[in-house]
Curated annotation (Swiss-Prot):
SUPFAM superfamilies documented for this protein: YbaB-like
UniProt KW Mitochondrion keyword: no
Location in the cell: Cytoplasm, Nucleoid
Organism: Borrelia turicatae (strain 91E135)
HAMAP family xref list: DNA_YbaB_EbfC (MF_00274)
A GO molecular function held by the record: DNA binding
Protein name: Nucleoid-associated protein EbfC
Similarity-based family: Belongs to the YbaB/EbfC family.
Principal location: cytoplasm
Length: 99
């Protein structure tokens, strides 16, 4: 069966619109990665840009440097995982099979 080039171009235009909609949805995602019972909280958007890092002051004196570094790393990794999951949940039903 031959493919009509005009139909193909129409479909490509729709595909571009879908991509633009995905980008908009993804940019609106905001997640919080947490570590150490919320001692460290990292807020990140769907484009993996960190918007905020919060470290509870009352734990500074109780934590050594290595423990704090580990919690910060864990909170970042948690946020990254959550962004990936949000992107996956928003796009899986909308992307045509095989793409």
């Amino acid at each position: 069966m031959a493919v009509n080039p005009l139909d193909f171009l129409k479909n490509m235009s729709g595909f571009k619109d879908n991509i633009d909609n995905f980008k908009k949805e993804i940019s609106q995602i905001v997640v919080c990665g947490r570590a150490g019972s919320d001692v460290v909280v990292v807020e990140m958007n769907g484009e993996f840009v960190v918007k905020k890092v919060v470290i509870k002051e009352e734990f500074f004196s109780d934590l050594d440097n290595e423990a704090l570094e580990h919690m910060i790393k864990s909170a970042f990794n948690d946020a990254i995982s959550k962004v990936k999951e949000e992107i996956k949940s928003k796009t899986m039903g909308s992307i045509p099979f095989g793409i």
